[in-house]
Curated annotation (Swiss-Prot):
PANTHER family per UniProt: RECOMBINATION PROTEIN RECR (PTHR30446:SF0)
GO molecular-function terms, A-Z: DNA binding; zinc ion binding
SUPFAM superfamilies cross-referenced by the UniProt entry: Recombination protein RecR
Role noted for this protein: May play a role in DNA repair. It seems to be involved in an RecBC-independent recombinational process of DNA repair. It may act with RecF and RecO.
Gene: recR
Protein name per the record: Recombination protein RecR
Biological processes, Gene Ontology terms: DNA recombination; DNA repair
Length: 199
């Protein structure tokens, strides 16, 4: 089916979203145009406002509408702990655990093949953030992928000489998981990171 230029432009715009392919974008576009024009206009207005009004926190680099995000503006948080994550969505995930420390958001992970070196993801800014000596522990909460592990290892190499405690989030068997359903790599990490039981 051949679409008009405006419909084609809408479909192409929707395809930039993660997980949205050609067919899904077509269905979304046609749904908005045929059945929910007011919803489409609300979506367009909300998207415009967000793109114009949401920026980055000047301390942790997560998404926020203010100069400081709510976590950085909160004086009750533990200033001795810094959790390093790969993206703003990771801040929201860690917040669900009840973590009360501070954050630093990288812009992804090291990937030399994609041209993403330490400067591109913000490692110099991270080193600047810990330079004042306020933090006693840095928790590396990058993703458990090859790139995430490489990023955590690189950061640890940069921070260990500063005398900080450097920790890595644990990886392993999910709570309630069954061993026969866990992949070999995850199970190997779980075995390597085992802890003694104290009674």
């Amino acid at each position: 089916m051949s679409f008009s230029p405006l419909i084609r432009q809408l479909i192409d715009a929707l395809r930039i979203l993660p997980g949205v392919g050609q067919k899904t974008a077509q269905r979304m576009a046609l749904q908005l145009l045929e059945r929910d024009r007011s919803g489409g206009l609300r979506l367009a207005q909300a998207l415009t406002r967000a793109m114009e009004g949401v920026g980055y926190c000047r301390q942790c680099r997560t998404l926020t509408e203010d100069e400081l995000c709510p976590q950085c503006a909160d004086p009750r948080r533990d200033d001795s702990l810094l959790c390093v994550v790969q993206s703003p969505v990771d801040v929201f995930a860690v917040e669900q655990t009840g973590f009360r420390g501070r954050y630093f958001v990288l812009k992804g992970h090291l990937s030399p093949l994609d041209g993403l070196g330490p400067e591109a993801i913000g490692i110099p800014e991270l080193l600047g953030r810990v330079a004042d000596g306020a933090f006693s522990e840095v928790i590396l909460a990058t993703n458990p992928t090859v790139e995430g592990e490489a990023t955590a290892h690189y950061i640890a190499q940069m921070l260990i000489p500063k005398g900080l405690t450097i920790s890595r989030i644990a990886h392993g068997v999910p709570l309630g998981g069954e061993l026969d359903l866990v992949d070999g790599g995850t199970l190997a990490h779980a075995l390597a990171g085992r802890k003694p039981i104290s009674l």
